[in-house]
Swiss-Prot record:
Residues 30-163 are annotated as: Disordered. The keyword Membrane applies. The chain crosses the membrane at residues 3-23. One of its GO terms (biological process) is protein ufmylation. Interacts with Atg9; the interaction is transient. The gene is Ddrgk1. Residues 1-2 are lumenal. Residues 24-312 are cytoplasmic. Signal peptide: none annotated. This is DDRGK domain-containing protein 1.
Length: 312
């Protein structure tokens, strides 16, 4: 679009220049036209453009002066001064013409004025064009900068998202691995417990009963036992001890609870009955009152085997 505008401006400028050149050449033609050669048989004044009527009048005056007698001295002066007066009038006419010519601006001056206006207009257009180009350049640079910043921001977001995804994936894999190991450990302990049970079945029945009785008595005597210590005492694994205690609780051989600290608290049937009787008598009991009463109703002090037999 800008190229078409520039081509149109160039064509218009060329037309103006050609027009000015033709006008200047036309105005300068009368000044530079060579003088024509004088025609033969034509008076000098006629060749110089003097009117024919004036020439005839001058000829008549000349003949009258030749045929007339000599005039008085006072009358001769005016006759002699007449041509001079006409000559002065001719000079005045020529001076007036020269003054008129001086008042008319010549072609070069006219072309210079018109050229200055045109040049100022062209310079203004050129300045606007350069300004538009600079604005377009700045706009393009700004777009490029914004696109670069957007690409960098998107790249940073993608990088952060990838890091977060890897972190979540690592946590998930670690959790799965931990659960898998725990499950494998559980299966191993379960298999070992099954082997121990099979060994008991294959062994002597009296020995099995003795070991089981010792296991139960150890818990009753100590009242509060650490499961790991119990496993070491009977050469079992901790999970095997937990499974055996749960089995004994299920068949009613042992009564108690396993807390979250890895301990089993044994409570006898008599102690449970005393606690139940206390709750029934009081009706509604708070946890604080129950805890205070349980310390009196439930004995958590380890007792010896002899003491247990005496009490029984």
């Amino acid at each position: 679009m800008e190229l078409i505008i520039l081509v149109g401006i160039a064509i218009a400028l060329l037309v103006v220049i050609i027009t000015l050149y033709l006008l200047q050449k036309k105005n300068a033609a009368p000044e530079t036209k060579p003088a024509a050669a004088p025609q033969r048989g034509v008076p000098q004044r006629a060749q110089e453009g003097v009117p024919r009527r004036a020439q005839i009048a001058r000829n008549q005056r000349n003949r009258l002066r030749q045929n007339a007698p000599a005039a008085p001295a006072g009358q001769v002066a005016p006759a002699a001064g007449a041509p001079a007066a006409r000559g002065d009038s001719d000079h005045e006419d020529e001076g007036q013409v020269d003054a008129d010519d001086a008042r008319v601006p010549q072609g070069a001056v006219l072309d210079e004025k018109m050229g200055a206006k045109k040049r100022a207009k062209m310079e203004a257009k050129e300045q606007k064009r350069l300004q538009r180009e600079q604005e377009l350049h700045d706009r393009e640079q700004r777009k490029v900068k914004e696109a670069k910043e957007e690409a960098e921001r998107k790249q940073q977001e993608d990088l952060e998202a990838e890091v977060e995804r890897k972190r979540v994936e690592a946590e998930r894999l670690a959790k799965e691995e931990r659960e898998r190991k725990e499950h494998e450990e559980y299966l191993k302990m379960k298999a070992a417990f099954s082997v121990e049970e099979e060994g008991f079945e294959e062994g002597d029945a009296d020995e099995q009963d003795s070991l089981l009785a010792g296991f139960i008595q150890y818990i009753r005597d100590n009242k509060v036992v650490v499961l790991e210590d119990l496993a070491v005492a009977f050469k079992l694994k901790t999970q095997q001890v937990i499974d055996r205690i749960q089995e004994l609780q299920a068949d009613g051989t042992l009564t108690g609870v396993i807390d979250d600290r890895g301990k089993f608290i044994y409570v006898s049937e008599e102690e449970l009955s005393a606690v139940a009787k206390f709750i029934k008598q009081r009706g509604r009991v708070s946890i604080t009152e129950l805890a205070e009463s349980s310390n009196n109703l439930i004995n958590l002090t380890p007792i010896s085997a002899g003491g247990e037999e005496a009490s029984s």
